[in-house]
């Protein structure tokens, strides 16, 4: 269910900003980024992360996916750490939409809570995993929501490439699975089940063989959009680091202690060796 320290991708490296890297996106065909694409940013501060996860809480509570809590915030424990990157986009002065990307790490992935055997099977075959989760959108317009999702998935794909990962996994409601399959080439890797993290709502586990799919001549629309509009490694270099001192006294710390009995300061301290991102050559 968990990956060992020896399977980390960092090998004791420092953060992106302190390393000379070979940018994998230099190999990809380039085209101009569409001016109509909803803007996205990588969260660089505690305030931005908590604002994003407050939106997740608001939307998930409204949909009946989670119980209310006094911190008015929602986070999966596996998403808190230096292996994570919180992506968000603005809607006026507020966070309008968000998703969280988290690499496989010693705590495992959120989907391990229901698909540990299947994920362990992928790990044994050499897959290096990135989970996409905690998606939320403030807007009610379906067309605008799809545009934001395309934009955020572009960030997810390039985060996976820059961190030398092979697969992206995601758990979605059955009615959303076809979108990811048709627009990105995701495939089911295990049967649907109920998901305790969202009040036992149904979940379909999907897997994108990232590098295999990108090597094909013809790509699904979403994957082609990400390929043709690359992001540099520097886009992630100042992401919020989830250092113990940054989390101390935060809403994140309070929520994780109250809900899961986890002290993120202590957990983050034990994971300091995983600070860096291993970039592909």
Regions found by a protein language model. Give the residues of each.
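Short acidic N-proximal helix/loop "leader" segments that mark the beginning
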Residues: 1-35, 251-279
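Short acidic (Asp/Glu) patches
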Residues: 68-76, 80-84, 109-121
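Charge-rich, low-complexity intrinsically disordered segments
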Residues: 200-269
């Amino acid at each position: 269910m968990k990956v060992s320290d020896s399977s980390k991708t960092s090998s004791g490296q420092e953060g992106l900003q302190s390393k000379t890297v070979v940018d994998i996106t230099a190999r990809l065909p380039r085209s101009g980024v569409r001016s109509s694409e909803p803007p996205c940013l990588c969260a660089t501060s505690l305030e931005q992360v908590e604002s994003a996860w407050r939106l997740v809480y608001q939307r998930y509570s409204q949909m009946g996916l989670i119980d209310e809590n006094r911190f008015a915030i929602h986070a999966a424990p596996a998403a808190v750490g230096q292996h994570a990157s919180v992506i968000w986009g603005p809607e006026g002065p507020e966070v309008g939409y968000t998703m969280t990307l988290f690499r496989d790490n010693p705590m495992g992935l959120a989907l391990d809570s229901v698909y540990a055997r299947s994920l362990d099977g992928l790990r044994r075959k050499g897959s290096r995993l990135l989970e996409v989760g905690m998606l939320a959108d403030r807007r009610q317009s379906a067309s605008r929501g799809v545009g934001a999702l395309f934009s955020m998935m572009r960030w997810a794909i390039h985060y996976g490439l820059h961190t030398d990962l092979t697969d992206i996994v995601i758990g979605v409601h059955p009615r959303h699975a076809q979108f990811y399959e048709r627009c990105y080439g995701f495939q089911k890797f295990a049967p649907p089940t109920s998901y305790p993290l969202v009040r036992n709502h149904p979940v379909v586990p999907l897997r994108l063989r990232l590098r295999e799919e990108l090597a094909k001549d013809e790509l699904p629309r979403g994957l082609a959009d990400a390929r043709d509009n690359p992001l540099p490694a520097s886009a992630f270099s100042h992401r919020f680091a989830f250092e113990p001192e940054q989390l101390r006294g935060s809403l994140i710390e309070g929520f994780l202690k109250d809900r899961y009995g986890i002290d993120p300061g202590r957990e983050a301290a034990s994971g300091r060796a995983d600070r860096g991102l291993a970039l592909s050559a």
